[in-house]
């Protein structure tokens, strides 16, 4: 038998690898068709590569109802699913995770099938205090609602993170969920939002323990994307231990920690601050400490050490983000949050900007935003959240005597 030359062997191996690789790729991408095609009632509008954590995101529309879908694949993350709905009383959202696409689908069928079909009773939860604050800062905004209203199909979003080979079954189920949902009028993001016209100072009571504290927020009207990027960078810098905010607050209110973040409603954005455990008598002192920290940032900027510390922390976060145990859920909820603001496809850019915050501190962009956007704004909300008593359960009619023996399971 004639022996093959070494060159021929290498050529055959190359062809084999190419063939297997191409077939594997084709099988993996076959679940989601090309842009403009449809699968299980969903039309593919756009597909983009994700720089971090890798993989792809496909943006689809349910042709029968207009519901939105984001399908994330090839990230290596554990399967996850988020379903969100915009209701007349704010946003409703739930996220499921699983070890496999099949398990995710089974869990979804058990717990999500009727989630948006009827009104849900509003109950106190961990976000109730924050929502109460947003109701004062951004009256009527979606994020201030509890999602108790009914969600129609036009106002729904599903975000799926799963292997492509599980896409067909999941999309088929979602097609049924959206098709069965009640028809209704499409709601624009923050349709009921009305901007405050003067400083607001309120005290609100929230049932339950651990909800007390003081919030202070500053609204930037008609904030463009560049303003929002700089506000996010400021929040990342100021919430760190040892920051200008941390020092000013602790000097004014010893043993008090403060956190900060950003929020938006309509065309407006805001930077907010929260100190848990403070009471109404501390509210103005907290507000003044926050403003003092902002004035210091506008005058002297941020130290080289603060910039270096933030840069190192964000670089580490960027490198480890693809290795997160909850990566699938984090991606799903990130896309859903961007959708709630008006555009799900904005999430990848938000991730990139989040990891660039230190650069905006170093070049003076954040100090400029403080001077031109925050310290000049008179639209503020100072809100004290006081823990209130839990509601007593409603009395129920006397129940009939229970049987002495439980019925056998069927």
What are the language-model segments listed below?
Residues 37-50, 94, 123, 127-157, ...:
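Histidine-acidic residue clusters that define the catalytic metal-binding segment
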Residues 4, 26-37, 83-154, 288, ...:
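Acidic/histidine-enriched segments that form metal/cofactor-coordinating
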Residues 4-90, 106, 154-252, 381-409:
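His/Glu-rich zincin catalytic helix
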